[in-house]
A protein has these predicted regions:
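General beta-strand structural signal in soluble alpha/beta enzymes
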Residues: 62, 151, 160, 180-182, ...
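Thiamine diphosphate
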Residues: 92-104, 122, 128, 132-135, ...
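A short glycine/serine-rich beta->alpha loop
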Residues: 2-4, 18-27, 55-63, 106-117, ...
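Terminal amphipathic helices with adjacent charged low-complexity linkers/tails
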Residues: 55-56, 240-252, 256-336
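A short, small-residue-rich loop immediately preceding and capping a beta-strand
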Residues: 22, 58-59, 109-112, 142-160, ...
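Glycine/charged-rich beta-loop-alpha catalytic/anionic-binding loops adjacent to active sites
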Residues: 10, 14-19, 49-58, 98-112, ...
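Cofactor-binding active-site loop characterized by glycine-rich and histidine/acidic residues
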Residues: 32-173, 390-391, 432, 436-440, ...
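Non-catalytic terminal/interface segments that mediate subunit docking, oligomerization
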Residues: 313-496, 554, 573-582, 588, ...
Length: 708
């Protein structure tokens, strides 16, 4: 039997054995794509099993994540730290081989996949990050960032709407180092897809600016390898789709080519028949040493990385500042002066005490942070002028219409010294005259995603996972529903992605209930490991941005107003970052010696409403504390002593927020001023009155709570 056939059959055997032992899983796709994996991993993929985090490795994404045993088998066979015992513990509690691939759980897994269509979209993010980093950091003779992104995807990924968003942007951005291999087996859970999936996939991708190859025999490793080689040679900077006709469950005499191969164990009898059909006489989980030897990539991977290390050493000698900056950014570390930048930004906001919408406050903070952090990569889903995600430091990202290359801004007229070359957007080779061939202008750092909220969110996940950039993107809060599953995936993966959601309430006014967020803040707060901030003025907004940028292990959602918000005077800025703090005590409104009898908790624009109600109550000698709680999720993580200090147990609590009331009762509220219906189309001031968001109603609600 040919070497490639044995290598593929090793995948098939491990897949069917692991699924059978777990009595759970998907053997069909791994068995069908085994030859594709042999071609890619054996002939083309650049990787080192001993160092899954090598900076210039190729990235591989298994978009059809239910085929996880394909990936686990390959990682084990090629020499990653994934043992045969790990394979035997497939889908078991706390194993390194969960049901779907999870980043940071299994060495060699680049992204968490399972929700179909998101993997190929992550891959677009990976490829975009590689292209931008190459434009920023590579210099003549020093192609230090130079790797491909590969993705396997299936019929389900093709059917998901997000795939249309992703491939459209990949074509527009000319991501020539993105190569996708389509497992075209014509089968889904419900059977043969022909009655409900009639797309001409090749023409669809070509219409989006891709090259296509095939259809080819996806069960012929040599044909697949030749197609990959052809794709790698493309000279037009277009991404490539390779259409691979495969047979799901290949090798299984009675299940191959049927939906029965998809999502259940083959059974002991069928596995025995399959072993015979494949001429694989080995016991479950037994792999011949010769097959291990054919698969092993330890030596080749070590050589590949060592060769790159030599080139990087030369690069570091020529451009020490650039090299250090690249390493810092790939590690996800912030600049050493970030804390000072954050402090200055917050203090400036406090000193100016401007009355602006929090979306504008966000842009003001972004001006400071994007100037200090060249890794910030912004964007908007066709709402830049509303989300205000652009800054002076983040011009629009553009690509040359002819070549597809990243368009750079003007190089500096006076070249920087070698000591000043740490900023890749304006570096030179250390010369002192006009720009040299090594000089680079800045790349664009603001992306026009078009009306593609879901695609934007999942692409940002890929960018964050790749490293080198901190992605943020904007849309209206109501449209966060389009992005929700990608937001959830970012939280699950524990990666730094920042979502800017503006027009956060009925305060947007006349556009009406289709655009007015009611349930969205509460809904986002339910996602584990997602920080949600709804700041109430410029200082709180600056703090929210600073915390989001420092948060390397969780994504952040910033909920921002359309309407202007007055600045809330405050004596101490330090506690804002704890998610909630006392913004006003009774003595502020003339009740110095009066005992506090209640606490008003408010978020966002409603903090001003709470402060106005506090004054009305003070006129009646009713002393209330006002607590601003810009981030319930952050406050919930604080120590018990701090929580008690902010929200004393014995005091009645009244929450005020223009949204669903359900999430507030956990704070022991006696009453909540909120909205549990959809909004209305009317000017914002009329809506505030209609829904009871007046100082008078808040004050009356407090009095009513005190009478109980």
């Amino acid at each position: 039997m040919a070497k490639e056939a044995l290598m593929a059959n090793a995948i098939r055997a491990l897949a069917m054995d692991a699924v059978q032992l777990a009595n759970s899983g998907h053997p069909g796709a791994p068995m069908g794509m085994a030859d594709m994996a042999v071609a890619l991993w054996g002939d083309h993929l650049k990787y080192n099993p001993a160092n899954p985090h090598w900076l210039d490795r190729d990235r591989f994404v298994l978009s059809n994540g239910h085929a996880s045993m394909l990936l686990y088998a390959v990682l084990h066979l090629t020499g990653y730290a994934l043992s045969i015992d790990d394979i035997k513990h497939f889908r078991q509690l706390h194993s390194k081989t969960p049901g779907h691939p999870e980043v940071d759980v299994t060495p060699g897994v680049e992204t968490t996949t399972g929700p179909l269509g998101q993997g190929i979209t992550n891959a677009v993010g990976f490829a975009l990050a590689e292209k931008l980093l190459a434009a920023e950091f590579n210099r003549d003779g020093h192609a230090i960032v130079d790797h491909h992104t590969y993705a396997f995807l299936g019929d389900g990924c093709m059917m998901e709407g997000i795939s249309h968003e992703a491939i459209g942007l990949a074509g527009a951005w000319r991501l020539g180092k993105l190569i996708a291999l389509y497992d075209d087996n014509g089968i889904s859970i419900d059977g043969k897809v022909a009655p409900w999936f009639i797309d001409n996939t090749a023409l669809r991708f070509e219409a989006h600016g891709w090259n296509t190859i095939g259809p080819i025999d996806g069960n012929d490793a040599h044909a697949v390898s030749a197609a990959i080689a052809q794709a790698r040679k493309n000279t037009d900077n277009k991404p490539t789709l390779i259409l691979c006709k495969t047979q799901i469950g290949k090798g299984s005499p009675n299940r191959a080519g049927t939906a029965k191969a998809h999502g259940e164990a083959l059974g002991t009898e069928e596995i025995a028949l399959t072993r015979t059909a494949l001429d694989w006489p080995y016991a479950p989980f037994e792999i011949p040493e010769a097959v291990y030897a054919d698969w092993s990539h330890k030596d080749a991977g070590a050589r590949a990385e060592a060769e790159w290390d030599e080139r990087f050493a030369a690069y570091s000698a020529a451009f020490p500042g650039l090299a250090a900056e690249l390493i810092r950014r790939m590690k996800g570390e912030l600049p050493k002066d970030f804390n000072q930048v954050a402090f200055d930004t917050v203090v400036a906001a406090h000193s100016k005490a401007e009355t602006v919408a929090s979306r504008k406050a966000s842009q003001l903070a972004l001006e400071s942070f994007t100037a200090a952090l060249p890794e910030m990569l912004g964007g908007s889903a066709d709402l830049t002028g509303s989300n205000l995600t652009n800054t002076k430091s983040t011009p629009q990202l553009r690509f040359d219409a002819e070549t597809g290359d990243v368009v750079l801004g003007e190089a500096p007229a006076q070249a920087a010294s070698a000591e000043d070359e740490s900023q890749p957007g304006s570096t030179t080779d250390g010369a002192t005259s006009a720009p040299t061939p090594a000089a680079r202008g800045p790349i664009g750092r603001h992306i026009n995603y078009g009306v593609r909220e879901f695609g934007m969110a999942a692409i940002m996940n890929g960018v964050a996972l790749h490293g080198g950039y901190i992605p943020y993107g904007g849309t209206f809060l109501t449209f966060s529903d389009y992005s929700r599953n990608a937001i959830r995936m970012a939280a699950l993966m524990k990666h730094r992605v920042i979502h800017v959601f503006t027009h956060d309430s009925i305060g947007l006014g006349e556009d009406g209930p289709t655009h007015q967020s009611i349930e969205h803040a509460a809904s986002l707060r339910l996602i584990p490991n997602l920080d949600v901030w709804r700041p109430g003025d410029t200082a709180e907004t600056a703090v929210a941005w600073a915390v989001a940028l420092q948060n390397r292990s969780r994504p952040t959602a910033l909920l921002l107003s359309r309407q202007n918000i007055a600045y809330a005077p405050k004596n101490d800025l330090g506690d804002i970052s704890r998610g909630a703090y006392v913004v006003s005590e009774p003595e502020v409104v003339g009740l110095k010696n009066k005992k506090t009898v209640a606490v008003i908790i408010a978020t966002g624009s409603e903090v001003q409403l709470a402060l106005a109600a506090q004054k009305l109550l003070a006129a009646k000698k009713i002393a209330v504390r006002v607590v601003s709680m810009p981030s319930t999720t952050t406050f919930d993580r604080q120590d018990v002593a701090y929580k008690k200090a902010v929200l004393p147990k014995k005091l009645p609590r009244i929450a005020v927020e223009m949204g669903c009331t359900g999430g507030w009762w956990k704070y022991g509220c006696a009453a909540v001023v909120g909205i549990d219906t959809f909004g209305e189309s009317a000017p914002a001031p009329e809506l505030f009155k209609h829904f009871g968001f007046t100082a008078e109603n808040v004050a009356a609600t407090v009095e009513s709570a005190l009478e109980r």
